């Protein structure tokens, strides 16, 4: 039986592969089971896949201590890597955020990623809205086509 994680990761990879760029995908499972590196002709991206199986908007995501450690390990091992979170919102789509975008909505009083919660919502035919701690809203919306455009 195919797990939700396999199904949803597979959908994300299909969009990435069909984007048209020549890429290499490496599963860095030694760092974290949901961490991947994507190498294109222009950059190297580290991507943490996070999944919400909630059927409708809004989708919640919380970063664990293990994910925080994995992000730090990835950045220490690969100096020039760009980090992204691919927030898979069940079957709706993928809200792709850069590290800088994440930091704009994170609670600055908390450790870097550990315990940070964000909420992603989307109305029909619109972009994703991202809210962080204390209802801090990201200034700009995230277009549905940000995945995989941002990472390649």
Residue ranges and their predicted role:
Residues 1-34, 38-43:
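Acidic-basic catalytic patches of nuclease active cores, encompassing PD-(D/E)XK
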Residues 8-12, 69-73, 101, 146:
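Exposed alpha-helical structural elements
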Residues 14-21, 78-81, 107-114:
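Structural alpha-beta junctions
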Residues 29-65:
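Conserved catalytic cores of phosphodiester-cleaving nucleases, focusing on short active-site segments
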Residues 30-33, 80-81, 123-124:
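A short, compositionally biased
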Residues 37, 45-50, 84-88, 93-101, ...:
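Ordered hydrophobic segments in well-structured contexts
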Residues 53-94:
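Catalytic cores of nucleic-acid endonucleases
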Residues 99-152:
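Non-catalytic C-terminal interaction segments of nucleic acid-processing enzymes
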